Amino acid sequence: MTDEHFDTEATPNPEDVAGSVDDRFENRIVMSVPDEHNPKLQKVIELVNADDDLYGLWLAANVNAVERLGMTDHGPVHVKIVMNLAVRMLRLLANAGVTSGVALNYEMSAKDAEVVVALAALLHDVGMSIHRQDHEAFSLFIAQEKLKQILQHVYDSRHETIIRSEILHAIISHRSGGTPLTLEAGVVRIADALDMAKGRSRIPFE
């Protein structure tokens, strides 16, 4: 795993938080995470990068956070960093013998746990596109349908329901006072906290 490159230091261009809709899309942040050994995660990232609706939600979330509320960014750069941090931590824990929730309770694989963590990280703040207040609950509302659209290309209906439920649990667990009940949810909560404050805090993994 030493040759894997996790992008945990992406920085937004000025265009990412200013300009017309077309300008913002032209300066699109491409989602990526080391996924060559996980075909399911690879497919998920491919679908995410082809989804203009999802990218628009990230842009709207960032406008509310940065331009209207003066907060740190909650858009595509933030979720990309959180995803890379979360997947990296999950792999380190898996290598140390820690069992994921989907493995413990459903006999699913570490690759499935990576899908849970990646999509929870990517969707945890989409509710900011509506409002900061109660954004975690809004994120659940938005993510429910978006996850169905993405996961139907990766899982059969039975497994899709379980994976979607695990992702939604991880999303709601990142709220203040939230209680993660799975390894995956805990990892996403920590990864979100690590990408913090203005200027961002970074943990070097390489």
Predicted regions and their residues:
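Acidic/His-rich, divalent-metal-binding segments that scaffold phosphate/diphosphate chemistry
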Residues: 3-135
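Amphipathic alpha-helical interaction segments
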Residues: 81-84, 121, 138, 166, ...
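Amphipathic alpha-helical interaction surfaces
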Residues: 85-88, 92, 149, 193-196
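Histidine/acidic-rich helix-loop-helix segments that form or flank divalent-metal centers
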Residues: 104-108, 156-206
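Short, conserved phosphate-binding/catalytic loop or strand-edge motifs used
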Residues: 117-119, 140, 163-169
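Post-HEXXH active-site segment of zinc metalloproteases
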Residues: 132-145
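Post-HExxH zinc-binding segment in Zn-dependent metallohydrolases
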Residues: 146-157
